[in-house]
């Protein structure tokens, strides 16, 4: 636990060095250089606090503190540095157009957690580019009980403010690991006896024919290009998601959701008596 800040500092100038420091966290380069990310808004803060996270900086307006006195006290107790800031300063710190009055910084070592070595349901993502899609996928993964997520380094940055917001905080709940190359990971999964499932439009087998009660890794690629050939070659099953003939394809976040909920349905049915 971080120590309680005895005397909260006040920032009223948008030229304060901390404003520039936190604005740098809007970009991947700044987050990597500082080793921390930016949480914006009450909901993300609540999720982080529920996970026992501690913060380098907690910044909030007087209006936000008045509306959320208990949460403000918890934030100060869990922050190395706490600041009461003006609305103008908060707006400069945040990446959103209309921030709700609070931001906090979280160290990267509290975000990245290695997935368990033997996940019953895991998700692998290659070259995913859209932050909204990734955030939605992470939210769905948390809802369906995914135990671990592996992303290639050329995916959109999961620590970006847009991904964090669109995941509604779910990205803070999931063990995630970033990798330069997928084949070594997939080969390890093979040796563990996991089935590796990818969606391919021309596949003759549908996802409904897969036994998701077996330990499974679901693999999805970029919105435009799908999975690379080396990754596809390492899958154990290639399946199609049935759809009307006039529809070319599903959005990748929707496709992931369909697959994960089918897996969850089968697992739930198997564990329900009768």
From Swiss-Prot:
One of its GO terms (biological process) is methylation. Coiled coil: none annotated. Pfam families: MRM3-like_sub_bind, SpoU_methylase. One of its GO terms (cellular component) is cytoplasm. Keywords: Methyltransferase, Transferase. Its EC number is 2.1.1.-. Gene3D superfamilies: 3.30.1330.30, 3.40.1280.10. It is an enzyme of class 2 (transferase). Disulfide bonds: none annotated. GO terms for molecular function: RNA binding; RNA methyltransferase activity. Belongs to the class IV-like SAM-binding methyltransferase superfamily. RNA methyltransferase TrmH family. This is Uncharacterized tRNA/rRNA methyltransferase slr1673. It comes from Synechocystis sp. (strain ATCC 27184 / PCC 6803 / Kazusa).
